């Protein structure tokens, strides 16, 4: 469905939107190969904290013993202390699902609220959720329902941003263009949109996207390599990250041949990159209602695409030039855990977009 806000209607009636696959997701619990109760800090929200403080008996004692001063559970051998030997949750078993803290109940679901609009989605860092994001070759769709809302934001600007996002979705889902040209087109469009916002001409934000001819542009391989190298400067969240990036840098010894061969190999599955880009635009673009920075959100989607594509080439090469849906999910989960789950790492890219010459607008187009 169209993701623009409808005008009119009842006072304080808002829209709640989710991707069509959202309600199909269910946690697979102990069967999960990449358990989110292992290696992750579990933050306890205030409401759950009060509940845990009041639980009686032996289990209540254990709850309080395992909490630290930062209101999170202290991991034991890198595992949540309530993850049992069957990889199931003892809090769930002992005091019920409704007593799980918010992060455990919600993850991998995320919720963003923009005044009259609430949007939910599935985060890409969970393997089961990522499978829903990537497995369908049909364009990502969205469902909406009405709800009462209280929070306020600049509704007029939100409407403009929703229109901008819908235009970007239209480009990303236009399968007559190759994926690289789609990314360049949305970067050009976001650049024009940002120019109008910066000059206080929000009412002149372009209502449609200009198509450009990118046939003469040549990829700058050195800049692609520099882009991957930046990943070594991130705060390390995942132990395997550095090794994966160093391995990926090896593809640049024979990049022209390898990337050309991979492009042919993956050409029937470009929809996976389309779904990836729609995910990033859906999750992040409307945050511009708070900071007026559309271009950075689109650049973040674009740089994520560039980096993940290089990770894909490297994994394909390691696998004897095979690359399955499971490989796609592993790369995207790793990237998401490393980048999306660390605000410092998102901020790092935001800074690079401002100051690193490889992200100067026209130069950036040539690394896509």
Model-derived segments and spans:
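General N-terminal leader/first-domain-start detector
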Residues: 9-60
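Immediate flanking context of iron-sulfur cluster ligation sites
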Residues: 14-32, 66-101, 118
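Short, charged/polar micro-motifs that form catalytic or ligand-binding hotspots
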Residues: 27, 94, 154, 158, ...
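Membrane helical hairpin/interfacial module
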Residues: 40, 44-78, 83-86
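Internal, well-ordered alpha/beta segment that forms a basic, Gly-enriched binding/recognition surface
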Residues: 87, 95-182
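Hydrophobic, aromatic-lined core segments that form the binding pocket/scaffold
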Residues: 176-368
